[in-house]
């Protein structure tokens, strides 16, 4: 059975309620601080060099295709081995990616933030550095005034952190999973912050994505527990068996 939409309405409500609203507010406030203090522009001037761009380039493709390929690979592995846990993990990752993309797209459609200049042309910064004008304040609030590709928060970052934190919530006792998840999320996020996004878009995406991933992860973790132990009985050895 497809569990991609398992408790979806409840999870959406959870993302935008209680403490999670405070985290969302912190993403907004942190963005305002970084932008108004000149942090975005300073970070942009410091990081737009060839070496950073070359290291970050693979993340642009990874961040675009992994949200689809990763859940599919886990799902195929789970179906092939008839492993219910892997199948549930695949649906959890899929929902985390879906919600992160949906929420990010809605935010971008409203905030309409202009992207950093010279996308993919890091070498031009050194040649024209003195003539550059700070464009980090370029928000176009409204609806679809800046499209849904560029903008606040970073979609690559939000989806990466959402999937990573979802996986960590499901396998939180596994040091390998925790390390892999965090490395993946930070690589994607930092990579886009030195190429196609402002630094504040990375920070906001990391916060919002973490909230989404933890919410979805908790939801599917409950599903795993209930299916593993009918009747809702807890098992102290569950985490140890991860």
PLM region descriptions:
Residues 24-26, 90-94, 177-182, 203:
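Hydrophobic alpha-helical transmembrane segments
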Residues 77-109:
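Interfacial segments of alpha-helical transmembrane regions
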Residues 24, 28-29, 93-101, 105, ...:
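Alpha-helical transmembrane spans of integral membrane proteins, capturing the lipid-embedded, hydrophobic core
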Residues 128-242:
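Membrane-embedded catalytic cores of phosphoryl/pyrophosphoryl-handling enzymes
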Residues 8-9, 37, 75-85, 170-173, ...:
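Structural signal for the C-terminal ends of transmembrane alpha-helices
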Residues 1-74, 108-143, 236, 240-241:
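N-terminal transmembrane-helix/juxtamembrane module of multi-pass inner/ER membrane proteins
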Residues 30-37, 100-105, 183-193:
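Aromatic-anchored segments of alpha-helical transmembrane domains
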Residues 36-37, 100-101, 105, 109, ...:
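Transmembrane alpha-helical segments of multi-pass membrane transport proteins and ion-pumping complexes
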């Amino acid at each position: 059975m497809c569990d991609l939409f398992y408790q979806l309405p409840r999870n959406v409500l959870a993302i935008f309620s209680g403490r999670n609203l405070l985290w969302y507010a912190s993403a907004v406030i942190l963005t305002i601080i970084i932008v108004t203090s000149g942090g975005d522009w300073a970070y942009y001037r410091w990081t737009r060099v060839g070496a950073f761009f070359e290291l970050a380039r693979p993340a642009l493709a990874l961040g675009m295709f992994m949200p689809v390929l990763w859940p599919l690979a886990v799902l195929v592995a789970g179906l092939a081995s008839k492993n219910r846990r892997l199948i549930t993990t695949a649906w959890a990752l899929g929902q985390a990616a879906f919600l992160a993309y949906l929420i990010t797209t809605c935010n971008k459609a409203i905030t309409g933030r202009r992207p950093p200049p010279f996308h993919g042309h890091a070498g031009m910064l050194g040649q024209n550095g003195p003539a550059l004008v700070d464009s980090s304040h370029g928000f176009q609030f409204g609806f679809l005034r800046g499209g849904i590709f560029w903008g606040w928060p970073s979609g690559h970052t939000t989806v990466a952190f959402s999937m990573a934190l979802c996986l960590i919530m499901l396998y939180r006792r596994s040091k390998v999973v925790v390390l892999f998840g965090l490395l993946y999320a930070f690589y994607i996020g930092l990579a886009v912050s030195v190429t196609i996004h402002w630094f504040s878009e990375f920070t906001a995406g990391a916060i919002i994505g973490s909230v989404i991933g933890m919410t979805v992860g908790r939801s599917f973790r409950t599903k795993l527990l209930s299916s593993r132990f009918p009747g809702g009985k807890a098992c102290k050895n569950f985490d140890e068996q991860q």
